[in-house]
A protein has these predicted regions:
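Long, compositionally biased
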Residues: 169-171
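Charge-rich, well-structured scaffold segments of protease-associated domains
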Residues: 1-167, 179-207, 212-319
Length: 319
């Protein structure tokens, strides 16, 4: 599971022996991968030139390359990348953790190995166990088979905070559509702010509630104001607290590019009015109840609870 500032390798099983086998397989894959021995794996999984016939066009192929080409065909993925790039130009969040297909072919095998050997070390990792198991036995096995084989290594993987900008930045980017699609009302408008620190749990809870009260609930003030102005056919908010400096966004999909200034003005004026008159108490209570229910229910669908609890823990380790 690739995140902007970490990669998670989770394993889970209700069968004890299967769980032990999976631990061994994944730990071996992370710390002793064959890709560091065979460049052919890098070419297959990363990128390579491919010529199927002497008269055919030389093409670029590769598992990750094709995956990211597919991802970049999604306007939502492009928007997400552009939000990070515009807000965090001076740290790692400006780079797409999955790889930008435009730049993937510039990655050499040597550069890949340098990166792997620099960061992929037990000293630069967190390993956690969750569930009904013999924890002491698992820790002893982990130390004997893997951790004791390494000396401690100081790895500088600290992420520097992005300083605040002196003024608002306006950024334009493009995404692809089919030849038959009209460009009319295909613009995504996004208003984004960096808010606080991921270690501030109270702030995280507050913005989770504010997201509901301001833009997600029926008749939410920001959402309703944009809808009444005819800006976009889908308005939503998002609060990303999974990185060092959380981001709050308002987004209008399928809008007109000429509405950008009005979009910004409506959001700021509506927020000022909310500050002056207060948030609707019913919406606020509904947001609090929704947030509390999520925590009490702890229903993560197809994902094991231990995995999601761990991911939440990693959010607190973003520094």
């Amino acid at each position: 599971m690739t995140y902007p500032d970490k990669t998670v390798y989770p394993v889970a099983s209700c069968n004890d022996q299967d769980f032990k086998n999976l631990m061994d397989v994944y730990l071996d894959a992370v710390f002793n991968p064959n890709i560091t021995k065979y460049e052919e794996i890098f070419k297959q999984e990363g990128w390579h030139y491919e010529l199927t016939g002497k008269d055919d066009e030389l093409k670029i192929n590769g598992v990750v390359y094709n995956e990211m080409k597919g991802a970049y065909s999604s306007p939502d993925e492009v928007l997400s990348s552009q939000i990070y790039r515009s807000l965090f130009p001076d740290n790692t969040y400006s780079k797409d953790s999955g790889g930008n297909p435009e730049y993937i072919p510039k990655l050499t095998y040597e550069a890949y190995l340098d990166f792997y050997h620099k960061y992929y070390h037990p000293s630069n990792s967190y390993i956690y166990l969750y569930g009904d198991m013999d924890v002491v036995e698992r820790l002893e096995w982990l130390d004997k088979e893997y951790l004791s084989l390494y000396d401690y290594k100081k790895v500088n993987s600290e992420i520097n905070k992005q300083p605040a900008f002196d003024e608002i930045k306006n950024v334009e980017a493009q995404y692809s559509i089919t030849m038959d699609d009209s460009q009319e009302n295909k613009t995504y408008l996004s208003y984004n702010r960096v808010v606080g620190d991921s270690l501030d749990e109270m702030l995280y809870q507050a913005f989770d509630v504010l997201d509901y009260a301001l833009v997600s609930s029926p008749g939410a003030p920001v959402k309703q104001a944009l809808i009444d102005a005819g800006i976009g056919d889908d308005v939503y908010g998002s609060y990303d607290a999974g990185i060092l400096q959380p981001v709050f966004s308002f987004v209008a999909k399928n809008a007109n590019a000429s509405q950008a200034d009005e979009f910004e003005s409506i959001i700021e004026n509506t927020l000022k009015e909310v500050v002056k008159t207060g948030i609707n108490k019913e919406a606020l209570l509904a947001g609090i109840n929704s947030s509390e229910f999520k925590f009490r229910e702890a229903d993560f669908g197809q994902f094991p609870k231990g995995l999601l609890f761990g991911i939440k823990l990693f959010r607190q380790l973003a520094v």
